[in-house]
Amino acid sequence: VDFFAELEKAIKDSWPKPKLLVLNFPGNPTTQCVELDFIEKMIEIDSENEIWVIHDIAYPDNAFDGYKSPSILKVPGAIEVAAEFYSLSKSYNMPGWRVGFMSGNSSLVAALARMKSYLDYGMFTPIQVAAITALEGPQDCVHKITETYRSRRNVLCDGLNSLGWKVEKPRATMFVWAPIPEVYRHLGSLEFSKKLLSEARVAVSPGIGFGEYGDDHVRFGLIENEHRTRQAIRGIRDMFRNDQKFVSVGGGIP
């Protein structure tokens, strides 16, 4: 399937005409990553069709194995049609502080500023000061956080693969988007998630929660340390053994 051809066809066939396209790379929940040439093509298509573009880039710093997440604003001409949302939640370990910023096309930025003036009174000043300090200070913390996620990713993915549950290591984000093993796929993601919770004591997000096309996946969050992650893998291993229909093919749990 030619993604860009399908996108252009969807734009052409839609009525009313789309006004805005939202991109999310690295993606949540799929962890999908793209290179700059993909972004360039998206800007070309959207410019030709006079569509605004919003890029939700929450995980640019949580990238592994040499991958670098491209900003949409690196593309020449993108400023004419695009804006980007950046969050400090993952890069600076500030989830719940609800702090980030928008940059890009001045009309889009002004529209958001006007809308927010109707909805709230601005962010608590100490949070703004903390965000400025994080952005302007030493960035060692960002590298440390990314290394923590990378280590957790490796333990989880290596452990699942050692059980015969084939998953790919994501190149970015703090998630693993895991296809449900074939022998359990008939359950769907919600029932399989319930089974993991009750029998393996492992909590995951059912893919159906992200849309119907996610129903053959579950999402793991890299939010527990390596020791707890190994405990989770042992719980999954025991569930597989008890079911006697999914056989471990690997060595041990790393």
Where are the regions that the model predicts?
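PLP-dependent class I/II
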Residues: V1-P254
